[in-house]
Amino acid sequence: MRIWIDADACPKAAKDLIVKFALKRKLEVVMVAGQAVAKPAFAVVRLIVVPSGMDAADDYLVEHAVPGELVICSDVPLADRLIKKGVAALDPRGREFDERNMGDRLAVRNLFTELREQGQAGGGQGPYGEREKQAFANALDRILARLAKG
């Protein structure tokens, strides 16, 4: 089984946790990015830099990840495409994407996109701290255990 990472937007602390879990469970990690990013120096980690272009990394992830694998991403439309393909998706803050919550997640994402475009909302998510790391570690452990059972 592989853990895929949308590496352009994934916090370093989350990447470090993924590598730790992968080493412990003997899993492969594939980081996909639209530009060169720092790759942890472990044999289980591979970095793929896709040609630049709108959604090139997303398209690569959707094309190559298969059911039974996990993709770590913050991108809600990407997660929707993965879920429809039967691939598990988790954001770096520990929130799993699934068929039940995708509609709400897409609606909220679209609303905030509109508000930002109108200048009524700014910024993004808050800092990635210990609470977020712990929530991510717990969710990652739970999902990997579920995927290992098949």
Swiss-Prot record:
Recorded superkingdom: Bacteria
The UniProt entry's sequence similarity note says:
Belongs to the UPF0178 family.
Per its record, how is this protein called by name?
UPF0178 protein PputW619_5044
Identify the PANTHER family for this entry. Answer: UPF0178 PROTEIN YAII
HAMAP family per the UniProt record, alphabetical: UPF0178
Q: Name one Pfam family in it.
A: DUF188
- Check the UniProt entry and state the signal peptide residues, or none: none
